Amino acid sequence: MAAVSLSVSTVKPLGDRIFVKVAESEERTAGGILLPDNAREKPQVGEVTAVGPGKLTEDGKRQPMDVKVGDKVLYSKYAGTEVKLAGEDYVLLSEKDILAIVG
């Protein structure tokens, strides 16, 4: 089996899937207390790095995607598949898991 080199630029989502770079989690509380890695909340915000072509409708046409590369999005807390590439955290989501475009 040949080795596959994965990088952000080689990830091309299929259908209505979206590849999102996860935002950094807060390291300190509002009161200034430093949080260890295992006590931090899982972020639900990230930047879209790749977008699939859209879902096929029953008549064979592609439904356009509501998000584009560069959008900052809010997504469901337990949605998607987590991926780590080059030391960065990403999540692969379905479009239905995106709750809002922010900023």
Curated annotation (Swiss-Prot):
Cellular compartments per GO CC: cytoplasm
GO biological process: chaperone cofactor-dependent protein refolding
Major subcellular site: cytoplasm
GO MF annotations, alphabetized: ATP binding; metal ion binding; protein folding chaperone; protein-folding chaperone binding; unfolded protein binding
Keywords in alphabetical order: Chaperone, Cytoplasm
Location within or outside the cell: Cytoplasm
Keyword Chaperone: yes
Top-level lineage group: Bacteria
Keyword Transmembrane belongs to the record: no
Entry-linked HAMAP family: CH10
The family this protein is said to belong to: Belongs to the GroES chaperonin family.
Oligomer status and interactors: Heptamer of 7 subunits arranged in a ring. Interacts with the chaperonin GroEL.
Annotated NCBIfam families: PRK00364.1-2, PRK00364.1-6, PRK00364.2-2, PRK00364.2-4, PRK00364.2-5
Name recorded for this polypeptide: Co-chaperonin GroES
Organism: Thermosynechococcus vestitus (strain NIES-2133 / IAM M-273 / BP-1)
Gene this chain is encoded by: groES
